[in-house]
Amino acid sequence: SEMCIRDRADKLYRPASIEKVVTAVTVLDVLGKDFQFQTTLSYDGVVEKGILKGNLYVKGGFDPEFMELDMDFLVRAVKEAGIQAISGKLVGDVSLMDSIYWGEGWSWDDTPEAFQPYLSPLMLNRGCVDIKVSPAAKGKAGTVEITPESDYYQLNNRSISLHPEAGKLKITRDWLTNGNTIDVSGCVSSVRKRTLNLYDSKRFFMDTFCYKLNKEGLSVSKDSIFFLTAPDST
């Protein structure tokens, strides 16, 4: 065959949503229609008097739909195993992926948008938080709800309810410094929602898992969190 016409053939373009078609066809061909993503929970050592004398492992399988309810299921599984405390490590196995969390050609300034998460085999809520801001009494700070519940992120609420002089409502995070402080400012005149990514999805997953274990009365230290990575990861 011969080339009929060529226009900027060597220029790198972002494929946009048409890439979803190529991805879907490839996944169906390589993995098959019955493939299921798996996030597995296991431990080594022994459980004596409620204390796990060993390590607790969560192995990520790139599940894009692993949500807060799924994490709550993992927490229940730990409790049902009779574990009340962990003397070893809380291990996040992310060895299915290298350390490059964005694809080649992805724009760095698309963060903190939800469509550009920091990819990891361990993804909670697609690596994002859902934020809802509602007005309170006039002149008071707006009411901010963030899910999933976690202590991995912080909230800086500078919004003012029903006060136009406060300016346009802004919901963002300190992404330029890879921070995870959610900043809400401006006038809250009606209910507003936004979804933002968080920096370091694997850490978001494991920190939140530890937070939820502690909330259920299990003794687990965040200092015990450890990651198993691919051999070529940094």
Region locations from a protein language model:
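A common structural microfeature
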Residues: D10-L12, I18, Q38, N55
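A short glycine/serine-rich beta->alpha loop
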Residues: R8-Y13, T195
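Active/ligand-binding-proximal structured segments within catalytic/core domains
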Residues: Y13-V27
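Short, small-residue-biased leader/transition segments that mark boundaries at the very start
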Residues: M3-C4
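Conserved serine DD-peptidase/penicillin-binding transpeptidase domain
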Residues: V30-T234
